[in-house]
Amino acid sequence: MNRRGFLGLGAALGATAFAPNLLAKERFDVWGMPAIPSTMLAVASLQGELNKTHDMKLRIWNSPDQLRAGVASGEMKLTAAPSNVGVNLANQGINFGLLNIMTNGLQNIIVKDPNIKSVEDLVGKKLIMPFKNDMPDIVLRAICKKRGVDISKIEINYVQTPPEAIGLFLQKDFDAALSIEPMSSAAILRGKKMGVNVRVGFELPEVWGESFGIKPYIPQAGLIVDIDYYNANKEVFEIFHKDLQNALKWILENKQSAAQIGAQYLPAPEPALANAFERSNLTVTKAKDLTDELMSFFEVLFELNPKLLGGKMPDKSLFL
């Protein structure tokens, strides 16, 4: 190779060294929540078509405060969240919309006393739960109001996270815990090891349907997204939607393998995750295809407390 060729090659290699973006995959960051639907995000990130063209990164937020701070700072452009959070953000002037619903309800009441089988049975009992004024609390309050149960007569103790609620429920004298999957399944397994007989007293989606005369369906949580980011990447999000649908199908057909993946992201052992998939009402449905169901759900929340939605009902254009 002559001197001119050598210098040309050196220049080309030097340019490549200082321009890694020419070779690197584009980033696709998604934040999950500390609950079972994040397993779908994990499987899709590992196995999906989008993984072939993008550098997928999944992280889990641990509390609603972290979620809100991440969205406000711009760090979280795509994140799993309770469905009302996207509406609340939009009504505060933050340009977010609801991309999909990933569970039709994964909350239940776990109990030590087998006689607790209904919301009415919680009156006079000690209940522990996470996330005051967020979705678990909202759902319980809406059900109590509809059924005429005085929630002030339930001794409720609030904690910051689902694992904390489960730990205190097992160790202290609480009669019941409002929990989400996979923590409910984890509590049952941990209870057996500790000699504490824990069972599911009742499923909140079933009580919701019974109370409001509808299907046992709570469009509880899904992905919310920065609308400008979504509009600039619609084709990418279509691929991701299909990846999530395929991930759900694979999870239900391969529960043990899915549990191994989920356990890398969620604070629950593999057996608990494997047991939780079937009773978590998992789905992957675009928000715009659930407009009527979402509006009906948000009407209940608005009647309970308009602040839960940021002061007003959502515009249907928020459902992407």
Region spans (language model):
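N-terminal export signals
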Residues: G5-L23
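Short, glycine-/small- and polar/acidic-enriched structural segments
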Residues: A24-D150, I156-V159, D175, E181, ...
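Short, solvent-exposed loop/beta-turn-alpha elements that line the ligand-binding surface or hinge
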Residues: E49-T53, V207-P216, T283-T291
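Sec/Tat-exported extracytoplasmic proteins
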Residues: E75, A80, A90, F131, ...
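Pocket-lining segment of extracytoplasmic ligand-binding domains
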Residues: N84-V85, E164-I261
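Secondary-structure end/capping motifs
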Residues: Y230-L304
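Conserved C-terminal helix/tail region of periplasmic/extracytoplasmic solute-binding proteins
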Residues: M295-L320
